[in-house]
Amino acid sequence: MQNDLLTYNARSPLEDHAIVLRRRLTATLLAASLTLGACSTPVMVRETGERGDYRPVEKYVSWLIERDMAENQITGYSIALIDDQQVIWQKGFGYADLENKIPATPETVYRAGSIAKVFTSAATMQLAERGKIDIDQPLVKALPEFSIKTRFPEAGPVTPRNVMMHHSGLPSNYMGNLFVRNPPPFDMVVAGIKNEYLSTPPDFVFSYSNLGMSLLGATVEKNSGLGFADYMEQNFFTPLGMTQTRFASPALTKAYDQNKETEVFTLRDMPAAGLLSNVVDLSQFVKMQFAEGRSGTQQVLSPATTHEMVRVQNAKLPLTFDAYMGLGWLLNGVEVPGGGPVASHGGSLPDSHSMMAILPEHKLGVVILSNSATSAVSVTRVAAEALSLMLEAKTGIHPAPKATVRTDERAPSAEELRFFNGHFDTLVGLVNVSSKSGSIDAEAVGHHFQLVTHEDGLLSLKYKILGLVPVRVGLFEDIRLSTATINGRQIIVGKIGGESMVFGEKLRPAPIPENFLKLVGSYEIIGKIDGPSPDKIILKEEGGVLVGEVRFPEKPELLLRIAFQPVSDHEAVTAGLGSGRGDTLRLIKEDGEDRLAFSGLILRKKLN
């Protein structure tokens, strides 16, 4: 079913807090119940030195990292701070190998995860510079083998540009053999998706796609005559002096969860998340970006390309709000007040997290790599704090204090009570909302919340202890929700800090075809998955909505839910907007029985 439901993978809403605002909101919601009543470490006073003196930055960031590591049981952590062409500080904390007491250093190699997408996009742009690819032409021109079905014949094509900005309409993932011990070659997706559908019209909404990056990787191979890993080695890693960096599958690195070693699984989509590197090497890439594509005597990318990759690409699209995208780089999710645009990309795998973030206008950057499942929130927070402090040290621009504007609570209006009643697809999956009691109560991923209306028309969140008593939680204080109708769709807009984005959508009940109603029940995946897989998959009807529920043995307390909207007698799509939405569930006949097909997986109804 939906991507988070069928693989306990890089997009787990429990921990994936690093890449964009949507996952920051998700992690906040899910972390809140764990932080109620928790004691906090005393805050260290931020010191200010002379202009150009980064020693106070090093001191404060070291304290922040050590605090996060202690509070979240993070095993290994490395960081580098870059000012234009100079690495001003780099350090490792904790252990690369806990059992053998091998310390983490700046040279420690980690799984950099989705930072890979910046490199894959850079390779695509490099081939465009060389006249091999036109990023504004249909992808099929550069990759003739590419083929996928569509329900949007009037929409524009999938292009390399909209793939790089995650607006291609492609599914987020192709699930078959996605996250396993020994994955097949990533380019198997080219043939695999021929019977799949686009999830949305291209250039419609942000929908993060690992699949899209694998298609770009195949495009690089097709138009360069080299294997993807070889192309990256010859055209980026060697010219940049990144001697410890490579694209590899599987990854031979240690990983931990709460200081306990965990088995490392590999995302099949190497161009999307298969980068191995250290902070020393990644600093070289950042320096190249600041030097307009130059490294030493070599021009790796043109100045025009480096500027285009950090230029907002989706400003005019109605569902963008503040979720701005460059090419490969995300231009949202890391906030540095006064610093101008922040370009970043994080990497989030179940066992490790990373962040590479830059202030292009000031040529300041930070790279963070960690080998721990529990570092998801930390890598983003530390990156933002480090950039803010570096900005102050370099320019004298002081971090603007967060403006906390609180308006009085009020009773919800009749219109609000009407709107907030029913099923909503959100960043944390399917949410049931009820306003029958006169308040707006929501249930999501096994937790209970209350939506509180305010005089300014916005809504805030309270967590309901034991599902009964609504209380304010610090993690929710800067989250505000509002509603909007765009292209006929009833949208919930989420705002955290200074950034807004699509948080969810109200679902409209539609008749469920008899073919689907006959198939409600428990399911199993046919064929062994050599990696994490769900032990409970249920298809059910709930209040006129077709609902999928999944649990994983690794996280038995977490119930993941997604709604399906029928589009024909034999096809339904995951409901809502954004990543993992719009993907097709098909009824098929195989070996004389009715089965479900979803994104390369075949599901069979259990007999008992």
Regions found by a protein language model. Give the residues of each.
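Hydrophobic membrane-targeting alpha-helices
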Residues: 37-38, 127
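Catalytic loop of the DD-peptidase/beta-lactamase superfamily, centered on the K-T-G motif
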Residues: 39-91, 221, 226-233, 238, ...
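Active-site-proximal loop and beta-strand segments within enzyme catalytic domains
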Residues: 43-49, 66, 95-210, 217, ...
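Bacterial N-terminal signal peptides that target proteins for export
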Residues: 9-28
